[in-house]
Amino acid sequence: MTVVKGEGSISFAEASVEKYKNDAAFTNPLTIVGDGVVTYESSDPTVATVNATSGEVTIVGVGTTTITATITDTDEYAYEKKTASYELSVDPAINLAALSGDYIAQNGDVLTGTLAGNYKISIAAGASVELKDITINGVDDEAYKWAGLTCLYDANITITGANSVKGFYEDYPGIQAGPVGTTLTISGTGSLTATGGDDAAGIGSGYDGASCGDITICGGTVTASSAGYGAGIGSGYNASSGAITISGGTVYASSSMDGAGIGSGHKASCGDITISGGMVTASSGDWGAGIGSGFSGSSCGNITITGGTVNASSSSYGAGIGSGFSGSSCGAITISGGTVNANSGQYGAGIGSGSDSTFGSITITAGITQVQATRNYATAAWPIGKGFSDNDSGAVSIAGVTVTSKDWDGTGLTDLNFATSSTGSNNLTWTLTPKVP
């Protein structure tokens, strides 16, 4: 009688595996036909080690390694192919889904994945960090009093892929910029959606005495909103932020209630606002300006637009660009370039003051591509200048001409064309464009 051994085989479930450097230990299942003894080894233990008996892999570093299983013949089975292997690639990114506690991102870190727990994610002082397809969804629970992402000091954020960050409690922003005297810079080619709580900014500061430093956006597509009384980008309720600078990318900023789209929230303040490029759309839901100050004694510094395409609107008593409602203010408004479309839904000016508020001054030069400003509803409000019940605002100068009336017809202009239009209700639009030589 001739006894023939069985034909054995081994194979891994996956021919290749991709992991992140902070992922937990794992096993790629091995299918075995027969009763041979298997041992495992890693070609590069500086990337990952493997338990020789169980095949469980522990990630050590980043790079690529080959995990190999070797089986021996037995009395019952013979193995023509005695090895099986797979390639393991370890990405240097930090996988938020694998975190088991709070994490402070260090310089050079790439964050990715969806945060699975209610953990505080911060950026170390001075660190440059990439956000790559992250999702941080705050739960709006007072047990977790922090922002979706907190900058501990100066921070540089590069966005790639699609990213979404939401604060964990109503008083906290989606992204908390660093303290006063620091700068948060956002750039890249991806998208970022940042959502603050009821009393906080989307990007900036939180509620009641909170503050933050400067905010600079120079790339990517950034959508920032407050669920309530904060600015989309800037300060929260009764809070403050530093200067806001936008030089590139596409920016959408909005507040659903009394804050500005870009600027200050309710009873709040922010520094200078500068836009020199990109596509910017900013809106306030109720009594704040589209770009500028919020409601009830809020303030912002100078507003300067030198380029880009800017669309700013207030749905109620604030200006499109300028100050919000009720004792609010803004500094000097200067528009020297770009295409600007600003309008107020009710008692505010298109560019200037909100109802019962002020602006420092308005200067529009001949270097613009186009400026269009609309007042709606209240005939006392100007398209460019004073809102309803203005509190003694400063001078209005358009291409060197001092404007003293809401009924101005462009008299005195030499470098700009002036057009006026209305749909027959109380709205009024002024459009300024360069004269062609």
Predicted features along the sequence, with ranges:
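Solvent-exposed beta-strand/loop surfaces, strongest in extracytoplasmic domains of secreted
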Residues: 1-92
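A composition-driven surface/loop motif
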Residues: 91-437
